[in-house]
Design a protein with these regions (language model features):
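Helix-to-loop junction immediately C-terminal to a conserved catalytic motif
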Residues: 97
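Conserved ABC ATPase "signature" region
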Residues: 147, 158-176, 224-227
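Conserved catalytic motifs of ABC-family nucleotide-binding domains
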Residues: 201
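Conserved ABC ATPase signature
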Residues: 180-184, 188
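Catalytic Walker B motif of ABC-type/P-loop ATPase nucleotide-binding domains
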Residues: 205-209
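The feature captures the beta-strand-to-loop junction immediately N-terminal to the Walker
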Residues: 82-84
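Conserved ABC transporter NBD signature motif
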Residues: 105-113, 125, 163
Length: 287
């Protein structure tokens, strides 16, 4: 989705690319993110609701695997979708992305009814999607991977080179710029995938199993990236079976069980909530 063709004219007066607003980098200048907590804003302004669903429903073989799911994601926050296998969280996620068509309900994105829109049109609205499966070009270099996506945008050659270098530096992959993507580690591939996704300047980034198949150090790096993107104002929706890694980074999460949202709240609420433990986390769950 991130490479959907969407030519957008640029001028020297345009707003800078979203990644220019990402504070720090993976070269060590990012602020510490240990013991991350949701901070209450002292500003009276209410964050813009970028995504919300209304009564999403999906029926397979006469059974409602998703039955009336309402969620919302505001600009500048990280939201998780949690639940056991078969609960409906992945189907909900795919209905939002556009991979699965709902039998009922709505997907509203940035004031637009996206329910019937194909993925490429959702991408043009600003909905970015990073699939669990590897989506990079394995036989292109890191630099070529990013430049290939930039070809779909209205950059000059000089702008492409400058922005590509900036992205690689921001995500700590400039040292492997000329390496084939197939030679990268799991963490480097994830960073390249996220860097490519920002070329189209999404408003919402949907991450499908971002912590799957990477080692603990890479998980920490990916969490740092996600927090950096949050501080830049992106909205982020995550679904992942790695519960601790997900809860450690979200501002809040929805627990989906038997096709419905059964619990919703911050990490601290869900971890200490008896019903969340009974349905999904388990009585002995600790962070």
């Amino acid at each position: 989705m991130s490479a959907a063709r969407s030519k957008r004219p640029r001028t020297t007066n345009d707003t800078p690319p979203i990644w220019e607003g990402v504070p720090g980098s993976l070269h060590g200048s990012a602020p510490s993110t240990q013991n991350h907590e949701v901070q209450e804003s002292s500003d009276d302004s209410t964050p813009h609701t970028l995504l919300h669903t209304e009564g999403l429903k999906k029926v397979y073989d006469g059974r409602a695997v998703v039955n009336g799911v309402d969620i919302e994601v505001k600009a500048g926050e990280i939201v998780g979708l949690l639940g056991p296998n078969g609960a409906g969280k992945t189907t909900t996620f795919y209905m939002i992305v556009g991979l699965v068509r709902p039998n009922g309900g709505k997907v509203m994105f940035d004031g637009n009814d996206a329910t019937e829109q194909p993925m490429f049109k959702r991408a043009r609205l600003g909905m970015g999607y990073l699939p669990q499966e590897e989506s990079i070009f394995r036989r292109l270099t890191v630099k070529e991977n990013i430049l290939a996506v930039m070809e779909t945008q209205s950059y000059t050659k000089r702008e492409r080179e400058e922005q590509c270098q900036q992205l690689m530096e921001k995500f700590g992959i400039d040292h492997v710029a000329d390496n084939l993507a197939l030679t990268l580690s799991g963490g480097e591939k994830r960073r390249l995938t996220i860097a490519r996704s920002l070329v189209t300047e999404p408003k919402l980034l949907m991450l499908d199993e971002p912590f799957s198949g990477v080692d603990p150090i890479a998980v920490s790096e990916i969490q740092d990236i996600i927090r950096m993107l949050r501080r830049a104002g992106l909205a982020i929706l995550i679904t992942d079976h790695n519960v601790r890694e997900t809860l450690n980074i979200v501002d809040r999460a929805y627990l989906i069980y038997e096709g419905q949202v059964r619990r919703h709240g911050t990490k601290d609420f869900l971890v200490n909530d008896p019903e969340s433990r009974r349905l999904y986390l388990g009585e002995d769950f600790t962070m």
